[in-house]
Amino acid sequence: MADDATISITATLLPDEISKSISGSMTVTPDDTNDKWYYKLTACTATSTDLIAGSFLDYTAVDDDTAPTAITTSDKVKFLFIKNTSTADGVYVCFDGGTAANDLVDAVFIGPSQSWFGRLPNTTVGNIHAISSDIGDAGDATANLIVAALIDDVA
């Protein structure tokens, strides 16, 4: 469908002598009209902050006087895609509402020019925080991220 997200991936793993290519794909489909898309080029700084903020995309017809629907911290993120477009700095993302930091044991690190995606059915917008950083030490620059998400508008 036109409102779906489809991800295909091929990974080559293990040492050369026993390497294996594994491929897979997934499709994420909105369940109902409360599932809405979010897209933003986000400047992630060296201070932990919310990864998602602002408004949903208007991908259905609205008149010229209708403002975009605002995202709230209680909305549920059903699917999240992050592309780090920076060439030098990475980003740490935490999903439990804590402060994102380079020494957080349960954070995901997305390096320069790398992507990450996942389904997060019980994670709210207010739980997802990010900070720019180098792997293993604090960052000193802004990382630019393409953030796309399918979010359940619970408000």
Predicted regions span which residues?
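Asparagine-centered strand-capping/turn motif at beta-strand->loop junctions
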Residues: 81-87, 130-137
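N-terminal low-complexity, intrinsically disordered "leader/linker" segments enriched in small/polar
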Residues: 1-63
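Hydrophobic beta-strand residues in large extracellular and virion-surface proteins
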Residues: 82, 91-93, 128-130, 145-147
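Short, surface-exposed beta-strand/strand-loop-strand elements in extracellular ectodomains
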Residues: 74-77, 83-107
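Beta-sandwich interaction modules
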Residues: 69-71, 109-127
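Beta-rich globular "head" domains
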Residues: 50-86
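C-terminal interaction-tip segments
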Residues: 3-19, 132-155
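Intrinsic-disorder/low-complexity, polar/charged segments enriched in Ser/Thr/Lys/Arg/Asp/Glu/Gln
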Residues: 39, 77-79, 115-117
